[in-house]
Structures are given as structure tokens and as C-alpha cells.
């Protein structure tokens, strides 16, 4: 019974991340109708490449692994010439990672809910364009 209790507690903690949701959203908030090229990848998955139109977004919900080691790396490039770019870790462990591409950089807001919303509170600049 003792081992079952330990297993049940461990399993419950691991599954909590799946219930709370995991995902990436990338929103194009660039000016002058610029498009945004994006490509993200993890050890097991590739998202894109795709072009996000001005004002558009890319959203992907997924399950992270039981050990909490899921990582996604992303590369974003500003259109139309795609001369400014940035590569960065877009997801680690859990939660919803809400990224906003703006003229002066790339902003992040982490959400601990089950779905993305349109709130922009708690955004902070995480990356600058190269």
C-alpha cells in the first residue's frame, strides 16, 4: 500500500502539467503590415515554417513529457526582407508562453491557465532583434 501511495502521488504531480495545459502562441504586432516568418522545434516536433500575417497569430497546444523536460526553440524573422531575426527558447517545462513580436523586440507573458487570452498585462521584453 505504501508503494501504491507513493506512485499515486508521483503520477498525480506529473499529470498536473497536462491538466493545466502547455502551449506556445506567437502574435505578429509589427508595424507597417510586416509579415513574420516563424519556425519552432523540439526534440520530437517541428512547427512551421510559416508566415504569420500582420495582426495574425500562430497557436499550438501540446502535452509536455512526464519529466517536465519539454523544450521548444523558435526562430522569428521580420518581413518583407526578413533581415532582422532572433532565435530563442520559446517553451520550457509548463504553462502557456505568449510571445509578441514588436518593432523593438520580442515580448513574453507566461500564463498559468488552460487557454490563451487577449490580456497584455505582465508582458516584458525578452529578446531584441538582431
From Swiss-Prot:
Regarding protein family, the annotation reads: Belongs to the plant self-incompatibility (S1) protein family.
Which cell locations does it reside in?
Secreted
- Name listed for the protein in its UniProt record: S-protein homolog 22
Alphabetically, which GO biological process terms does the record hold? pollen tube growth; rejection of self pollen
| GO CC entries | extracellular region
User: Taking the first listed entry, what is the main subcellular location of this protein, grouped into a coarse class?
Assistant: secreted
**Signal peptide boundaries:** 1-21
Q: What's the source species' lineage?
A: Eukaryota, Viridiplantae, Streptophyta, Embryophyta, Tracheophyta
Key words, A-Z: Secreted, Self-incompatibility, Signal
Annotated source species: Arabidopsis thaliana (Mouse-ear cress)
Q: Which domain of life is it from?
A: Eukaryota
The answer to whether UniProt assigns keyword Secreted to this entry is yes
Amino acid at each position: 500500500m505504501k508503494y501504491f501511495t507513493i506512485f499515486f502521488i508521483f503520477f498525480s504531480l506529473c499529470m498536473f502539467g497536462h491538466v493545466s495545459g502547455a502551449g506556445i502562441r506567437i502574435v505578429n504586432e509589427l508595424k507597417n503590415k510586416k509579415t513574420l516568418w516563424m519556425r519552432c522545434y523540439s526534440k520530437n516536433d517541428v512547427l512551421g515554417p510559416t508566415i504569420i500575417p500582420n495582426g495574425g497569430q500562430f497557436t499550438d497546444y501540446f502535452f509536455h513529457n512526464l519529466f517536465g523536460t519539454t523544450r521548444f526553440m523558435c526562430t522569428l524573422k521580420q518581413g518583407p526582407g526578413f533581415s532582422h531575426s532572433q532565435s530563442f527558447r520559446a517553451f520550457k517545462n509548463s504553462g502557456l508562453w505568449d510571445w509578441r513580436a514588436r518593432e523593438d523586440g520580442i515580448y513574453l507573458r507566461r500564463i498559468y491557465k488552460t487557454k490563451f487570452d487577449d490580456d497584455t498585462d505582465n508582458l516584458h521584453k525578452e529578446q531584441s532583434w538582431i
